[in-house]
From Swiss-Prot:
Phenotype upon gene inactivation: Deletion of the gene abolishes norspermidine and spermidine biosynthesis, and results in increased accumulation of diaminopropane. Deletion leads to a reduction in growth rate of planktonic cells and severely reduced biofilm formation.
Species the sequence originates in: Vibrio cholerae serotype O1 (strain ATCC 39315 / El Tor Inaba N16961)
Protein origin, superkingdom: Bacteria
Protein name: Carboxynorspermidine synthase
Pfam families: Sacchrp_dh_C, Sacchrp_dh_NADP
PANTHER family: CARBOXYNORSPERMIDINE SYNTHASE
GO biological process: polyamine biosynthetic process
EC number: 1.5.1.43
């Protein structure tokens, strides 16, 4: 058995550590990235933490350009993995899926392939490019597990669990995500700044009363009392799992909410207003062409560097309301992750941890034959039971909290 991991950023760091801790099942591990030095740094950390469970298994680094399908196919054929785990940025998903199809090897990723902001890449068409592989993968006898992070990913498994055990009829699904931790910086992103800052500046698109609705970012807000973290303002925004939840778990309203502090929003709004968040090319006086968002990315702290001093909790969950046995019911299925615990385990912060742990939990379901049917699948389509039974032992627990039924007080912010 063996895996090929592509990507050596923050998520890739955690994925590699967790794969190493479970290499008795996953087998040999090859980590590949455009920068082989990043792969080697991860390997050094794994060995330094004694996280390689079976020292007889291989742990190697390779160089690859994840945009180059021919190079990817060549690497896959050389490594001969049973599963390719894509821990790279979203825009390489389709190239890696095509390479896996050509090499006839199964595939897993942690997010949708588009930015959710650009025309033709928004929530209603979010998975079109990857769902186009369904027949190809099925005919080739290989599996693709899409968006196996936390959100997207585990939150969809929570919804599937709710539909299977807790509800006869679902009215609303609200995915809620806050980071109650503190990294000590005035402004920083917890994962790739380019991906993060594109994601949160687009219009919010959500499903309501049989249609997609759209509002400007940060203009729909509610307050929610998170267990162990307290009350937080969360804002409606576009997110990957809205499309797949709408496809596989019918509900009257499906919406994603993320917590932002006032200071963060002040910085964000200022940078957006002066054009620093633009991904479009800009020509300087000397003729140099730059993209403001990429310049900003180069100036911001590397998300990996935030880990050593990070303190506090994250809380991410799925708030489901509907009926069970004819009675109204409201439940919040959630997880807490602790930044300090994550750093002690894998030398990284909890944001990356909550993506990397589910990816390896899903990979284990593939290797154990639980999630290995040929075809292309989102997490909602798969049996939630073995995944939720396994995830606590990989590093993330989960709980169910009963709430008083009643729709949230959603406020319009101008």
């Amino acid at each position: 058995m063996s895996i090929l991991q592509i990507g050596a950023g923050g998520v890739g760091w955690v994925v590699a550590h967790k794969a190493a801790q479970n290499n008795d099942v996953l087998g040999d591990i090859t980590i590949a990235s455009r920068s082989i030095a990043k792969c080697e740094k991860i390997i050094e950390s794994i060995k330094g933490k004694n996280n390689l469970k079976d020292s007889s298994k291989k742990l190697e680094a390779r160089q690859v350009n994840a945009d180059d399908i021919e190079s990817l196919v060549k690497l896959i054929n050389e490594v001969k993995p049973d599963l390719v785990i894509n821990a790279g940025p979203p825009w390489v998903n389709v190239a890696i899926m095509e390479a896996c199809y050509q090499a006839k090897v199964s595939y897993l990723d942690t997010s949708v392939s588009v930015d959710l902001c650009s025309k033709g890449q928004q929530v209603p068409e979010a998975y079109d490019a990857q769902w186009a592989f369904r027949d190809k993968f099925k005919q080739a006898g290989i599996t693709a597990i899409l968006s196996a992070g936390f959100d997207p990913g585990v939150v969809s498994v929570f919804a599937a669990y709710a539909a299977k055990y807790l509800f006869d009829e679902i009215d609303t699904i609200d995915v809620l995500d806050i980071n109650a931790g503190d990294h000590g910086k005035k402004f920083a992103t917890n994962f790739d700044p380019e991906t993060n800052l594109l994601e949160i500046q687009g219009d919010s698109i959500y499903w309501d009363a049989g249609e997609w609705k759209r509002v400007p970012c940060h203009t729909r807000m509610l307050e929610f009392d998170f267990p162990k973290c307290g009350k937080f303002k969360v804002y409606s925004m576009s997110h990957d799992e809205l499309r797949s939840l709408k496809e596989f778990i019918p509900a009257k309203r499906i919406e994603f909410w993320m917590g932002f502090g006032d200071r963060y929003l002040n910085y964000f709004n200022m940078m957006r207003d002066i054009g620093l968040l633009s991904p479009e090319p800009l020509t300087l006086q000397d003729g140099t062409v730059v993209k403001p968002l990429q310049v900003l990315k180069a100036m911001l702290p590397d998300p990996t560097s935030l880990a050593p001093g990070y303190k506090g909790l994250t809380c991410i969950g799925t708030w489901v309301q509907g009926k069970k046995d004819g009675k109204a019911r409201s439940v919040f299925i959630y997880n807490h992750a602790d930044h300090e615990v994550a750093y002690h385990d894998v030398e990284h912060q909890a944001i990356a941890y909550t993506t990397g742990v589910p990816a390896i939990t899903a990979a284990l379901q593939f290797f154990r034959g639980e999630w290995a049917e040929p075809g292309v699948f989102n997490m909602e389509q798969l049996n939630p039971d073995p995944f939720l039974e396994t995830m606590p032992s990989i590093g993330l627990g989960w709980d169910v909290m009963e709430l008083e039924p009643g729709q949230p007080d959603i406020q319009v912010v101008k």
